[in-house]
Curated annotation (Swiss-Prot):
The gene is purA. PANTHER family: ADENYLOSUCCINATE SYNTHETASE. Substrate binds at V300, T301, T302, G303, R304, A305, R306. The lineage of its organism: Bacteria, Bacillati, Bacillota, Clostridia, Eubacteriales. This is Adenylosuccinate synthetase. It comes from the Bacteria.
Length: 428
């Protein structure tokens, strides 16, 4: 595949960072196309662990070009903190291996303030935002009042846009919520400093990515979050503010759909979720606790404990359908090792019928009862398996069920967090 997508097929945290890192060795360009620093990707290389939030996972290879697309919302403060963190870890970052779209929207201090204020005002109806200003920034983008990277590069344009925006935002902050106004000069000075550091990285990434594909370079598009967090197909309103499915690539990276040759959906061998919202296969017993501890299920960005449950094949089937997945990469199958029995959800019982899709209505999804198929478990120690044949027979039966139900072949199986703990079935 010359231009392919790696995206999450559940509620995020599926292991996209590891999969992108693993696949990046064979590509030339890695592109982030949506989201912001609310994403959290963990990549382990040898005995080192890297936690990435905004920079594409390909940055850990010396010879890859990494691109932050126009569909991303960019917090310059978070970006430069991440660059500093990576450089201290020995990762070289220069304008020849990191590009930033001139059309990307900038997260401003008032976005983060409003994100926190609005979430607190919701009380018990909060939606679990990370408080990083992602939603308010996307709101400004759709209202056509946002400030883009290209606006920051033009200092006069930036000052004028900031002046207009801050007047409106301060009115909301002070008059609606009774909070303290933000200062124009301090924000302006801060972002003018960011401008100097950002400028060398800024390019028209649509042109760059298009030319890469046309020149037979291999391009990997790295998704953030997951299908069930998509603004349209997720469990709305407990979703993110961008399009996390394959269609988001065209908008967020500025290329046409005919240039994309494949889409790999990353999914855990079980299901997790952070924050509120329906979760049909959630486990509230000792098994759920065991999976959480065994899988180290705590958020990279928030540190919040993840809710855990059995694998939901209805969700994976939905993910495959809405993104046109060509392959699955299954992660953390080692976490289930040692359980005597494992289950997968093959349908929902809803209003006396069995359905195999995710309802749009939260109220309907909350009423859905999972229909399970039970399988025998497998040996705990599979972390050293190097080939598919070395996996326990019961694990293979489990994987075969995923392929059969979703009508999507599995191409990669992860048996641990390391690069070398990855089994490639060589069928992509």
């Amino acid at each position: 595949m010359s231009a392919f997508i790696v995206l999450g097929s559940q509620w995020g945290d599926e292991g996209k960072g590891k999969m992108t890192d693993y696949l990046a060795k064979d590509v030339d360009v890695v592109v982030r196309f949506q989201g912001g620093n609310n994403a959290g990707h963990t990549v382990r290389v040898g005995d080192k662990e890297y936690k990435l939030h905004i920079i594409p996972s390909g940055i850990l290879y010396k010879d890859k070009v990494n691109v932050i697309g126009n569909g991303v919302v960019l917090d310059p403060e978070a970006l430069f903190q991440e660059i500093d963190y990576l450089e201290k870890a020995g990762v070289d970052i220069q304008p020849d291996n990191l590009m930033i779209s001139d059309r990307a929207q900038l997260i401003m201090p008032y976005h983060k303030v409003l994100d926190g204020i609005k979430e607190r005002s919701r009380g018990k109806k909060d939606i679990g935002t990370t408080g990083k200003g992602i939603g308010p920034c996307y709101t400004d983008k759709m209202e056509r009042s946002g400030i883009r990277v290209c606006d920051l590069i033009n200092q006069d344009v930036f000052k004028e846009n900031l002046k207009e925006n801050l007047k409106i935002k301060n009115d909301i902050i002070t008059k609606v919520y009774g909070e303290e106004a933000l200062d124009f000069d301090s924000i302006c000075d801060q972002y003018i400093e960011y401008r100097k550091k950002l400028a060398p990285y800024v390019k028209d990434i649509s042109v760059e990515v298009y030319n890469s594909i046309k020149n037979d370079k291999k391009v990997l598009f790295e998704g953030a979050q997951g299908t069930l967090l998509d603004i349209d197909y997720g469990t709305y309103p407990y979703v993110t503010s961008s399009s996390t499915i394959a269609g988001g690539v065209c908008i967020g990276a500025g290329i046409g759909p005919t240039l994309i040759t494949g889409a790999i959906g990353v999914a855990k061998a079980y299901t997790t979720r952070v924050g509120k919202g329906p979760f049909p296969t959630e486990l509230f017993d000792d098994t759920g606790d065991w999976i959480r501890k065994s899988g180290r299920e705590y958020g990279v960005t928030t540190g919040r404990a993840r809710r855990c449950g059995w694998l939901d094949l209805v969700i994976l089937k939905t993910s495959s359908r809405v993104s046109g997945l060509t392959n699955f990469a299954i992660t953390k199958i080692d976490t289930l090792g040692g359980l005597e029995k494992v289950k997968v959800c093959t349908g929902y019982k809803f209003n006396g019928k069995i359905i195999d899709y995710v309802p749009a209505s939260l109220q309907d999804l909350a009423k859905c009862e999972p229909v399970y198929e039970e399988f025998d478990g497998w040996d705990k120690d599979i972390e050293n398996a190097k080939t598919y044949d070395e996996l326990p027979e019961n694990a293979k039966i489990y994987l075969n069920k995923i392929e059969e139900f979703t009508n999507t072949k599995i191409s990669i199986v992860s048996v641990g967090p390391g690069r070398d703990q990855t089994i490639n079935l060589n069928n992509m």
